[in-house]
Amino acid sequence: MKKRVVIGSRARSRAPEMLALLEQEGYELVLNPFDRTMTEDELIERIAGASAMIAGSDKVTRRVLETGRDTLKIVAKQGVGYNTIDVAAAKGFGIAVTITPGANSQSVADLTMGLILSAARNIPAMDRAIRAGKWYRHTGTELDGKTLGIVGMGHIGGGVAKRAHAFGMNILAYDVYPNESYTREYGVQYNDLDTIFRAADFISLHAPALPETIGMVNRERLKMMKPSAYLINAARGELVNEGDLAEALQTGEIAGAALDVYASEPPQVTELMRCENITFTAHAGAYTHEAIVGAGVMAAEEIIRVLSGQEPKYNVVK
């Protein structure tokens, strides 16, 4: 009997190269038939009897894992954020959970720089004005000589530092485990969070959603920022208190913001949506051809390793 692999990723996130690798191994592929993330019940319906799963934004709950526990060996996340997977339950059932570190780093770093530029020059406001028949020029700010504060210096944070350095920016950073090679290459200076929030002209978030980071950007921290400063979040929506951010934007406590991620996705219509000095994108940091192929192939390779009796490379279940 063929081993069955459930592909949770939507069609636009399924690289042909990923599917080809799995098909070459003779696996039966069960594809997500919807142009959206599958619900818990839809996953449960498909996971029974499966040997492996590739997860996109799917919420792989305890119920899902319990349904597949007799045959399921691995859930391979197509990306690095695994907060939608019940890792504790997976550990209890002996199921590996793997990630694809580095696969989308360049793409997210690219989008982050795009958001920084968009905020600095308020490109969306000019676009909206011209579409409405108005000739509007926004007086923006240059990046050269400005200070960028990066919170989280993993692969993505390092990629942002590389790009910001090329723009002539000074870089402050916070990370629990400082990587000194970034200091040598890009002049990154590590400091504490409060110092960074007070000193930076731009704050870019690249931290995971952990108990100690959820809600880290709140009213108190936003009040530390310069009135001319901008907040960028292309990491996890849970890091920012969106109500506090809306208030800071409306009262002029900070100059602007740009978000690619939200507390709930798709985001709810809130006061934040009514702010003019903010740019929104649709959690699109990893949505490039290169990142989709890279993450998909890495996830497929992890499945092949596990189903052939080998240890996975990037198992987050300890």
Predicted features along the sequence, with ranges:
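An N-terminal-biased, well-structured beta-alpha scaffold segment characteristic
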Residues: 1-98, 218-220, 224
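Glycine-rich, N-terminal phosphate-binding loop of Rossmann-like dinucleotide-binding domains
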Residues: 9, 55-57, 79, 205-207, ...
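Structural/interface elements that position substrates and couple domains in central-metabolism enzymes
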Residues: 11, 107, 166, 172-180, ...
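Short beta->alpha connector loops at strand-helix junctions that form conserved
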Residues: 32-33, 78-79, 95-106, 194, ...
